[in-house]
Swiss-Prot record:
Name of the protein described by the UniProt record: DNA/RNA-binding protein Alba
Annotated localization: Cytoplasm; Chromosome
Residue positions, PTM N6-acetyllysine: 11
Any single GO CC term annotated in Swiss-Prot or TrEMBL for this entry: chromosome
Modification after translation: Acetylated. Acetylation at Lys-11 decreases DNA-binding affinity.
Family classification: Belongs to the histone-like Alba family.
């Protein structure tokens, strides 16, 4: 999957990310990856579910990957942060 078919979830409203995913599919993408870290994980799940249930019912979840990233903190230690990648597929 090309890197341009990735939507990174942050602090913006959920519908901004939903629109980004729908735009990717409308431009011909067969798969779109929704990625998030930490507190944005629940927002990523919301984005995937809103796309599937409200806007594009033919889209399905192909794969869900979860993991942990070690991020450096201001005082030199490392903090573990959870990550998720939800791959949506349009048949």
């Amino acid at each position: 999957m090309a890197e341009e078919h990735v939507v990174y979830i942050g602090k913006k409203p959920v519908m901004n990310y939903v629109l980004a995913v729908i735009t990717q599919f409308n431009e011909g993408a067969k798969e779109v990856s929704v990625k998030a870290r930490g507190r944005a994980i629940s927002r990523a799940v919301d984005v995937a579910e809103i796309v599937r249930n409200r806007f594009l019912p033919e889209v399905r979840v192909k794969e869900i990957k979860i993991g942990t990233e070690e991020l450096p903190t201001a005082d030199g230690r490392t903090a573990n942060t959870s990550t998720i990648e939800i791959i949506l597929e349009k048949p």
